[in-house]
Swiss-Prot record:
<keyword id="KW-1015">Disulfide bond</keyword>
<dbReference type="GO" id="GO:0005886">
    <property type="term" value="C:plasma membrane"/>
</dbReference>
<feature type="region of interest" description="Cysteine motif">
    <location>
        <begin position="13"/>
        <end position="35"/>
    </location>
</feature>
<dbReference type="GO" id="GO:0046982">
    <property type="term" value="F:protein heterodimerization activity"/>
</dbReference>
<dbReference type="GO" id="GO:0007608">
    <property type="term" value="P:sensory perception of smell"/>
</dbReference>
<keyword id="KW-0106">Calcium</keyword>
<dbReference type="GO" id="GO:0005544">
    <property type="term" value="F:calcium-dependent phospholipid binding"/>
</dbReference>
<dbReference type="GO" id="GO:0000149">
    <property type="term" value="F:SNARE binding"/>
</dbReference>
<keyword id="KW-0812">Transmembrane</keyword>
<keyword id="KW-0597">Phosphoprotein</keyword>
<keyword id="KW-0479">Metal-binding</keyword>
<dbReference type="GO" id="GO:0042802">
    <property type="term" value="F:identical protein binding"/>
</dbReference>
<dbReference type="GO" id="GO:0098978">
    <property type="term" value="C:glutamatergic synapse"/>
</dbReference>
<dbReference type="GO" id="GO:0061891">
    <property type="term" value="F:calcium ion sensor activity"/>
</dbReference>
<feature type="binding site">
    <location>
        <position position="262"/>
    </location>
    <ligand>
        <name>Ca(2+) 2</name>
    </ligand>
</feature>
<feature type="binding site">
    <location>
        <position position="456"/>
    </location>
    <ligand>
        <name>Ca(2+) 4</name>
    </ligand>
</feature>
<keyword id="KW-0472">Membrane</keyword>
């Protein structure tokens, strides 16, 4: 029984000792209280094992960190060294000897200073064969020295940055339609060594319009027109106004040098006369047989108010009478200004060339408009003022006219504008402005086509007459354009006669150079 009690007590002691050990090592009991229970050698063994494990862990961590640092440095050197090497080595240094590349940069600076001093001083008589860099460095040959100087001068220059001028984006929509455009990159913008005065004169002359050049062109154009028009004799007539009876008295005197229309070498001429724009009332002379120089001496009277004479024209048509066929037209004479010779208070005799024609020219009326161009803004203003004596297009003897203006470039219509429609009138008044944006460098490439249209509610609108203005126009159209360019910023107003469009149809949109443009071809 005693042995069993001892075994139970010992087991209880072991369990208590085990619990105390767990509490001590778990940190729930202070170590000083536990140190008296355990032997000293055992506690020392536990502390030494802990110190060894901590030191071993520190060694492992240090070694891993050092290895990671070495690996990162190696990778960084492999990646960045080629870039640094390419930057450090100049592209032209390889052509120089190896001895120059090993020289210090301070020598380069001293050589540059010496070169500046030598340029300021007179040139020496002889070139030194070599220059000592230091007491320990070898001699540099003279050829290497000159190459070094050239290299330094080349890299010491400050390169100037140049930019090409860019055009304004305002007229991009206009330039897309133009077949010809100025290549800005081909213009030479280099700085020359010209004198300042001469360069200033060149700048001021660019873009300036010289009126005398345009005047010379207009004079030449008038001479060319006279040469182009074929004449077929002369017509002599006299004009006088009867103030009491309000009559215009026209006396057809004679004609000279008419062409032969018959097989016999003669003609049977007679003359028709109109006071335009009224074609309902006409007069005709007697027929003179077999003569090329007929003598008429016949008087005709047109009832007209004196104040209306400035808006009237005399139209003479000379015909060759043929009994069995259609009468052949010899030519015509149109007197636009009845006051060309005098005020008609007394009889005034007039000689006019007979212009060859095969058909009678129909008077379609006139249009008055003004042109004004602002070169700085690149803006052209066409003001349609009014029309007069338009041709009647309706059965009622009237028309419903409106004006259609097209901006043309080499037969293609770039833009179009139109005025309001005036109802039942042959003398409409508009006073409407039409604006086009045209860059100054493209003014000589464009023209304006002005068409007077008759509005028709049913069917197509009909063309009454057209006129053109521009550098490629003829007669008054070109003169009006040149006058606008010579006196820019000032409205220039003129009357223009309306002409029949050759081969016209009932619709203006399908005619000639005023047709709708084709879309530009894509590259």
């Amino acid at each position: 029984m005693s042995f069993r009690k001892e075994d139970g007590v010992s087991s209880l002691c072991q369990k208590a000792l085990h619990i105390i050990t767990e509490l001590c090592f778990a940190g729930q009991v202070e170590w000083d209280k536990c140190s008296g229970i355990f032997p000293a050698d055992r506690s020392g063994q536990g502390g030494g094992g802990t110190d060894i494990s901590v030191s071993l862990l520190a060694v492992v961590v240090s070694f891993c960190g050092l290895a990671l640092l070495v690996v990162s440095l190696f990778v960084f050197w492999k990646l960045c060294w080629p870039c640094w090497k390419s930057k450090l080595v100049a592209p032209n240094v390889s052509t120089l000897p190896q001895s120059i590349s090993s020289a210090p940069t301070e020598v380069f600076e001293t050589e540059e200073k010496k070169e500046v001093e030598e340029n300021e001083k007179p040139a020496p008589k002889a070139i030194e064969p070599a220059i000592k860099i230091s007491h320990t460095s070898p001699d540099i040959p003279a050829e290497v020295q000159t190459a070094l100087k050239e290299h330094l001068i080349k890299h010491a220059r400050v390169q100037r940055q140049t930019t090409d001028p860019t055009s304004s984006s305002r007229h991009n929509s206009f330039r897309r339609h133009l077949p010809r455009q100025m290549n800005v990159s081909s213009v030479d913008f280099s700085m020359g060594t010209e004198p300042v005065l001469q360069r200033g004169e060149t700048r001021t002359s660019i873009g300036r319009i010289k009126p005398e050049l345009y005047k010379q062109k207009s004079v030449d154009s008038e001479g060319n027109r006279k040469d182009d028009v074929k004449t077929c004799g002369k017509l002599n007539f006299a004009l006088q106004y009867d103030y009491e009876n309000e009559l215009l008295v026209v006396k057809i005197i004679k004609a000279l040098d008419l062409p032969a229309k018959d097989f016999t070498g003669t003609s049977d001429p007679y003359v028709k006369i109109y006071l335009l724009p009224d074609r309902k009332k006409k007069f005709q002379t007697r027929v003179h047989r077999k003569t090329l120089n007929p003598l008429f001496d016949e008087l005709f009277q047109f009832p007209v108010v004196y104040d209306q004479l400035s808006n009237r024209k005399l139209h003479f048509s000379i015909y060759d009478f043929d009994r069995f066929s259609r009468h052949d037209m010899i030519g015509e004479v149109i007197l636009d200004n009845l006051f060309e010779v005098s005020d008609l208070s007394r009889e005034a005799t007039v000689w006019k060339d007979i212009h060859c024609a095969t058909t009678e020219s129909i008077d379609l009326g006139e249009i008055m408009f003004s042109l004004c161009y602002l070169p700085t803004a690149g803006r052209m203003t066409l003001t349609v003022i009014k029309c007069r004596n338009l041709k009647a297009m309706d059965i009622t003897g009237s028309s419903d006219p409106y004006v259609k203006v097209s901006l043309m470039c080499e037969g293609r219509r770039l833009k179009k504008r139109k005025t309001t429609t005036k109802k039942n009138t042959l003398n409409p008044v508009y006073n409407e402005a039409i604006i086009f944006d045209i860059p100054p460098e493209n003014v000589d490439q464009v023209s304006l086509c002005i068409a007077v249209m008759d509005y028709d509610r049913v069917g197509h609108n009909e063309v009454i007459g057209v006129c053109r203005t521009g550098l490629d126009a003829e007669g008054l159209g070109r003169d009006h354009w040149n006058e606008m360019l010579a006196y820019h910023r000032k409205p220039i107003t003129h009357w223009h006669p309306l002409l029949e469009l050759p081969g016209r149809a009932t619709s203006f949109d399908s005619q000639g150079s005023c047709s709708s443009p084709r879309p530009p071809s894509t590259p």
